[in-house]
Amino acid sequence: MSKLTKSRKIRLAKATQQNRRVPAWVMIKTKRTVVSHPKRRNWRRSTLKV
């Protein structure tokens, strides 16, 4: 069992916050020209360099 340091925990939390979908109001405002954002990350497919 590995220990999580505070700095690593903060970086993981930041990565989780960045991994959100585009808000619905943005889709409405841009008339669905902006539907997804390119930096979206899947937990199985890609790894984090944390």
Swiss-Prot record:
Cellular component annotations (GO), alphabetically ordered: ribonucleoprotein complex; ribosome
A single MF term (Gene Ontology): structural constituent of ribosome
Ribosomal protein keyword on record: yes
Record carries keyword Ribosomal protein: yes
InterPro entries reported for this sequence: Ribosomal_eL39, Ribosomal_eL39_CS, Ribosomal_eL39_dom_sf
Cystine residue pairs: none
GO BP of this protein: translation
Cited Gene3D superfamilies: Ribosomal protein L39e
Signal peptide residue numbers: none
Keyword terms, alphabetized: Ribonucleoprotein, Ribosomal protein
Family indicated by similarity: Belongs to the eukaryotic ribosomal protein eL39 family.
Protein name per its UniProtKB record: Large ribosomal subunit protein eL39
Organism, as annotated: Methanocorpusculum labreanum (strain ATCC 43576 / DSM 4855 / Z)
Lineage: Archaea, Methanobacteriati, Methanobacteriota, Stenosarchaea group, Methanomicrobia
